[in-house]
Amino acid sequence: MELAKRFVDVGIFTNRLDEMRAFYGERIRLPYEEMLPVGAGVRQYRFGLLGSVLKINHVRDPIPARVAGGYRKLSISDPRTPMPLPMQDPDGNEVELAPSGQHGVNQIEIHIGVTDEAAFENFYADALQAERIGAGRFKLGETIISFRHDPAAVRAEKSPTAGAADAIASMRAVGMRYITVQVRDCDGEHRRFMSMGVWEGAAPVTLGAVARISFIRDPDGNFIEISQRASLTGPIPA
């Protein structure tokens, strides 16, 4: 997979905008970048995350509570931290500041609770072509993604492929709900995923002159956005 950016982005949904912005901007001290109106009552507040972007999607209407499993913890490398500092954000998402280099993390690590570790090993090695650095640990660019069995995790039921707007709507619940991988060729990567039998979340769609995106889902149904962003790759083909 040809990456356009060597850092994976993290998407959070929340109803508690002020508290979440204060936590990540003031307590964690991530630099605020910009707000993007997503539509359908959603505004995305973007924070720099050591090359990644933390996307806080504020939803105007009430959304369901956090669910077990899935993207469960975010570890952030922090040279100011002499020892691991576990905490929870205002929505209860697990966040950890960790000394730089601890367990090989010099950027961020995304932790996933899964139903079947073997299925995730195959998915990240074969479909996402990530570098295996240990049992249940892979490196995608500079970002580490790890997973372990979670008895509370539940595999989503497969449903007919929806459009991107419907896929985003189905993610709406409190918590870390998706990750974004920036690639050179969204359509080419999506075709490759489909040829391998990867679970489709949504077919590619163009977002004006900004990006072309699609969604795939991991073996448990967690969403992964595949994004070809014009600011990284040049103009989006017509």
Name what the model sees in each region.
Residues 1-34, 47-202, 210, 217-238:
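Glyoxalase I/VOC metalloenzyme domain signal
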